[in-house]
């Protein structure tokens, strides 16, 4: 699977693997920098995914509240 099509869960798993590798004292400086850079990109992608999900949830809550309000006003 390409990195562009990774699910949120797959990105989080990759981030966990990166952290484990960075904790390993035998990782070279060059590899550490590459891992850090990839981790930062994954972190940003996860943050965007979470913000989009939060917006969708908030939109759904607003829609539901409006539906309930409209239902209550038609009942009167």
UniProtKB/Swiss-Prot annotation:
Coiled-coil region(s): none
Entry keyword annotation includes Metal-binding: no
Family statement drawn from the similarity comment of this UniProt entry: Belongs to the XseB family.
Molecular function terms, GO-annotated: exodeoxyribonuclease VII activity
Self-association state and partner proteins as the record states: Heterooligomer composed of large and small subunits.
Keyword Phosphoprotein: no
Protein name from the UniProt record: Exodeoxyribonuclease 7 small subunit
Enzyme Commission no: 3.1.11.6
Gene Ontology BP, a term: DNA catabolic process
Listed PANTHER family: EXODEOXYRIBONUCLEASE 7 SMALL SUBUNIT
Localisation per UniProt entry: Cytoplasm
SUPFAM superfamilies found in the cross-reference section: XseB-like
Its biological purpose: Bidirectionally degrades single-stranded DNA into large acid-insoluble oligonucleotides, which are then degraded further into small acid-soluble oligonucleotides.
Keyword terms, alphabetized: Cytoplasm, Exonuclease, Hydrolase, Nuclease
């Amino acid at each position: 699977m390409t990195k562009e099509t990774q699910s949120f869960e797959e990105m989080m798993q990759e981030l966990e693997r990166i952290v484990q590798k960075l904790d390993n004292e035998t990782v070279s400086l060059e590899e550490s920098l590459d891992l850090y850079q990839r981790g930062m990109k994954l972190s940003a992608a996860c943050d965007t995914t979470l913000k989009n999900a939060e917006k969708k949830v908030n939109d759904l809550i607003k829609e539901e509240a409006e539906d309930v309000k409209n239902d209550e006003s038609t009942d009167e």
